[in-house]
């Protein structure tokens, strides 16, 4: 093996000779040489490289060399195209969002329209049947029966997910079903005795009973503004009652009892706090309550009025069998449909918006029934109804204002 000194990595000790200075010789046919050694580079002919143009273009791109007018125009057109494309993309996204928002608005408007339409048809057909067939327990049970069939159909077909509830949950739902049954029964009893418009005017007092029962059983004390909003409600209902042409005490107290039972249902639902599974949303809970209400009211029907919806009973009373059955079934379908649509709306909007929509719905039902049945209405009666409904609207707005927490 050669030593490091042999290969020139180390100078031999004591060597004092200095290296000859490097100098570049004149080019020779053999190439460029350094010092006295062999030529460093072999001779090659000169040729153009393709790298040079790219280097020039790169230099122009970074501004080292000015670009030609054609290249500058091309660059501007490219930048303009990119800007146009970005603007179009942003506009497309905004348009998609706007289109999605418009679709949701139209869908919500359609649901409100169906809610009002089903309510109108229910009240009109229900009133027509109750006027000639004064058996409100039978009619109410028919409505629960139709609702039960609809609920079972939706569960069997998979439109609604089958509920998975325990015995404890059924026991908690039972009181809700009981007051739900009584509330609808009292409403039908009132509709059979007085005008539709008057029943719904009395039912405008629901906020009064809601505040009263919540304070008594839940300890929820209302704000002074909420209490003040109840004054026009009570005053308007009183004024409308004094001037109501169809007034009778049975219809009046039935509507009042309906208010108490429906608001008791709301208080019970808060107090019992029914634990919901994933498959137990509001629509499913309403369907379960409807089925339970049918089985609760069926024996009561047998023990009180008896089964009066048979063809024999209807024909003996001189009633048109086809008309009674058709209108009863339409009213029952609309009864179940408008409550389902109401829950669908509640899932999309805030409770305050829903309560305002409910107030408007009551106005629509009152006006429609007055026009359809040609109910005589005096100016004082109209004023009382209007004041009561205005109070309901004011209540719904003030209810959302939460009292500020007291600081120490």
Curated annotation (Swiss-Prot):
Disulfide bridge positions per record: none
InterPro entries (alphabetical): Sugar_P_trans_dom, Tpt_PEP_transl, TPT_transporter
Domain EamA as annotated: residue spans: 124-241
The keyword Mitochondrion is annotated on this UniProt entry: no
Residue ranges of the TM segments: 105-125, 139-159, 165-185, 222-242, 245-262, 283-303, 375-395
Presequence boundaries: 1-66
Membrane topology listed for this record: Multi-pass membrane protein
A Pfam entry, by short name: TPT
UniProt key word NADP: no
Keywords in alphabetical order: Chloroplast, Membrane, Plastid, Pyruvate, Sugar transport, Transit peptide, Transmembrane, Transmembrane helix, Transport
GO MF annotations in UniProt: phosphoenolpyruvate:phosphate antiporter activity; triose-phosphate:phosphate antiporter activity
Function: Phosphoenolpyruvate/phosphate translocator that transports phosphoenolpyruvate (PEP) and dihydroxyacetone phosphate.
PANTHER family the record matches: SOLUTE CARRIER FAMILY 35
Recorded family membership: Belongs to the TPT transporter family. PPT (TC 2.A.7.9) subfamily.
Protein name from the UniProt record: Phosphoenolpyruvate/phosphate translocator 1, chloroplastic
Organism annotation: Oryza sativa subsp. japonica
């Amino acid at each position: 093996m050669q030593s490091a000194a042999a290969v020139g990595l180390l100078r031999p000790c004591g060597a004092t000779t200095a290296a000859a200075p490097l100098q570049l010789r004149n080019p020779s046919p053999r190439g460029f040489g350094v010092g006295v050694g062999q030529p460093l580079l072999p001779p090659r002919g000169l040729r153009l490289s393709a790298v040079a143009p790219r280097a020039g273009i790169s230099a122009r791109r970074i501004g080292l060399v000015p670009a030609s007018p054609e290249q500058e125009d091309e660059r501007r057109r490219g930048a303009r195209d990119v800007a146009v494309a970005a603007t179009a993309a942003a506009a497309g996204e905004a348009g998609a969002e706007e289109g999605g928002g418009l679709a949701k608005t139209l869908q919500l408007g359609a649901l409100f329209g169906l809610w009002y339409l089903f309510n109108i048809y229910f009240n009109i057909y229900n009133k027509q049947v109750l006027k000639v067939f004064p058996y409100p327990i039978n009619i109410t049970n028919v409505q629960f029966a139709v609702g039960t069939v609809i609920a079972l159909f939706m569960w069997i077909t998979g439109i609604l997910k089958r509920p998975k509830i325990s015995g404890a949950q059924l026991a908690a739902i039972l009181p809700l079903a009981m007051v739900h049954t009584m509330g609808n029964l009292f409403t039908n009893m009132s509709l059979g005795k007085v005008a539709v418009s008057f029943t719904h005017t009395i039912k405008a007092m629901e906020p009064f009973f809601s505040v009263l029962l919540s304070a008594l059983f839940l300890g929820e004390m209302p704000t002074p503004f909420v209490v003040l909003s109840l004054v026009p409600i009570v005053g308007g209902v009183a004024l409308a009652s004094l001037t109501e042409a169809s007034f009778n005490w049975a219809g009046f107290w039935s509507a009042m009892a309906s208010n108490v039972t429906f608001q008791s249902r709301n208080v019970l639902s808060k107090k019992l706090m029914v634990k919901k599974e994933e498959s137990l949303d509001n629509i499913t809970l309403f369907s379960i309550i409807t089925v339970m209400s049918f089985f609760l009211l069926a024996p009561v029907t047998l023990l009180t009025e008896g089964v009066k919806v048979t063809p024999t009973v209807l024909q003996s009373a001189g009633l048109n069998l086809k008309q009674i059955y058709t209108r009863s079934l339409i009213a029952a379908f609309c009864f179940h449909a408008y409550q389902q649509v109401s829950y669908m709306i509640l899932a999309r909007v805030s409770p305050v918006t829903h309560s305002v929509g409910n107030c408007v719905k009551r106005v629509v039902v009152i006006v429609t029934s007055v026009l359809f049945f040609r109910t005589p209405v005096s100016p004082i009666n109209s004023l009382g109804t209007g004041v009561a409904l205005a109070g309901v609207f004011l209540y719904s707005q003030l209810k959302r204002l939460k009292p500020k927490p007291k600081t120490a």
